[in-house]
Structures are given as C-alpha cells and as structure tokens.
Design a protein with these regions (language model features):
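Conserved hydrophobic position(s) of the canonical leucine-rich repeat
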Residues: 102, 129, 140, 150-159
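Conserved hydrophobic beta-strand positions in leucine-rich repeat
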Residues: 105-108, 130-134, 156-163
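Sec-exported extracytoplasmic/periplasmic mature domains
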Residues: 37-40, 152, 211-218
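The feature encodes a structural signal of leucine-rich repeats
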Residues: 116-124, 140-148, 171-174
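Short loop/beta submotifs within extracellular cysteine-rich repeat domains
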Residues: 43, 141, 216-220
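Cellulosome-associated attachment modules in secreted, modular CAZymes
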Residues: 187-222
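Solvent-exposed, polar/charged alpha-helical surfaces in well-ordered, non-transmembrane soluble domains
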Residues: 30-33, 37, 121, 145, ...
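N-terminal capping/linker segments that flank leucine-rich repeat
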Residues: 1-115, 119, 164-199
Length: 222
C-alpha cells in the first residue's frame, strides 16, 4: 500500500493512478481500457440471444465477477470494481504487475476474455510487458506494427507470446513467428491484388487484371 497524504488520499507518482490503494501506470491501464472499448464497440454476434449464458459477450461479462491480478507477488481477486456490470481494466484476464507496471497479460486459452475488434496501435505503450497471450479471441483487422516495439517480449516463446486462433488478417509484422499466428480465421480478410476474391493472389488474378485493362482500352477506342 501507499503512503496517505494529508487529505487521506493515497499518493502516486506522476503518470500513475491509484486504484484500491495501489499505484498503476496510467498508460498501461489505458491500453487495457482500449481493448475493452474496442470489444464493446465491435458489435460482434456471439449468439448470446439464442444461447444465453453469464459468460456470453465481448468482452466476457463474467470477468466482472472477479479479478485475477498479481501485484508485486500478492494475488488479488476482489478489487472494488467487481460486480458493477462493466468489465474494467483490472478485471481483464490474468495480469501480473510489478512496481506499478504491467508485466504480464494472459487473455487467451483457458481465460476466455472473448475480446473482439482491433488490437490497438497503442499496444506499444506496454513497454514493460514480458508476457502477452491473446490467443483464442475474436480480434479482427490487422496486427499493428507497433507490437514489434515491445522489447521485453520473447516473440519466439509461445508461452510468452501468442495471437493464434483469432480473425486477424495477414500480412503479419515481421517480428511475429508463424506459430504465434496459427489457426487464424482469415475468411473475412481481403487482400490487395486478390481480384477474384478467392483468398489468394495468383496467376488467375493477373489474367483477370490484364483482361480488365484490355477491355478498358478497347472501350476507349470503340
């Protein structure tokens, strides 16, 4: 816990905010909030009306019932924000914090965060993070190149980094190995140059493009 000032409020250094007597780096909290905001805004249909469940929704509404947060080695599962019908940053998956900085975020398999929408460009603000597991969610769009700025993440260790089983579209940033983006549903992705919409760029696209050019030239002469 933190020292109390004369007004009875916990003191945090500049750039940090106080939550339940602990200090958290504002930028880390802001990135977590963006994950949540993007999920609420995505409007993804998970069939919750047909198959109602306390854990059906994006983000997973059941996360509001508890928190899985480790702060300097102390495990907390009952922060004051629980059970207010809104998923908040410290309720998102399993988190590890040290000295007010987010060191690990596990929101993948067996956590069931059910996140959706785009991965925020601001993910690079998680400058101290070492573990980033976001597999088995509903993320779409592209993986931002800014993810490669996470200098403390071992991208080649699947226990430290995994984005598999999402709906993220290639090409993926060069820093990400193939096994971290396996089993991706790319059925809704569109590719520049994929003229016939078959999910591949090949000789058929070239033939179609040539024919389109020739047709345009013929029509301009006729």
């Amino acid at each position: 816990f933190l020292p109390v000032n004369d007004s009875g409020i916990q003191d945090c250094d500049n750039g940090y905010i106080e939550i339940d007597g602990y200090c958290f780096y504002e930028n880390d909290i802001a990135v977590l909030q963006t994950f949540i905001d993007n999920s609420y805004a995505s409007g993804i249909d998970l069939g919750c009306e047909d198959y109602p469940s306390p854990s059906c929704g994006s983000p997973n509404p059941y996360m509001d019932a508890y928190s899985n947060v480790s702060i300097d080695g102390e495990y907390l599962n009952s922060l004051s924000s629980i059970n207010n019908e809104i998923v908040e940053p410290l309720e998102l998956g399993y988190q590890e914090w040290e000295n007010g900085r987010l060191k690990g975020l596990m929101c993948g398999a067996f956590i069931y965060c059910s996140l959706s929408g785009e991965i925020p460009e601001s993910i690079s603000e998680l400058t101290e993070i070492e573990v980033l597991r976001l597999e088995v969610n509903y993320f779409d769009g592209e993986i931002p190149e800014s993810v490669c700025e996470l200098e403390n993440v071992n991208f080649d260790d699947y226990l430290s980094f995994d984005f598999s089983y999402n709906q993220l579209c290639p090409p993926y940033p060069d820093c990400i190995p193939d096994d971290a983006v396996e089993y991706m549903d790319t059925s809704e992705c569109s590719y520049n140059g994929d003229i016939n919409g078959d999910g591949m760029i090949d000789i058929l696209d070239i033939i179609i493009l040539v024919n389109m050019i020739l047709d345009d030239e013929y029509n301009s002469i006729a």
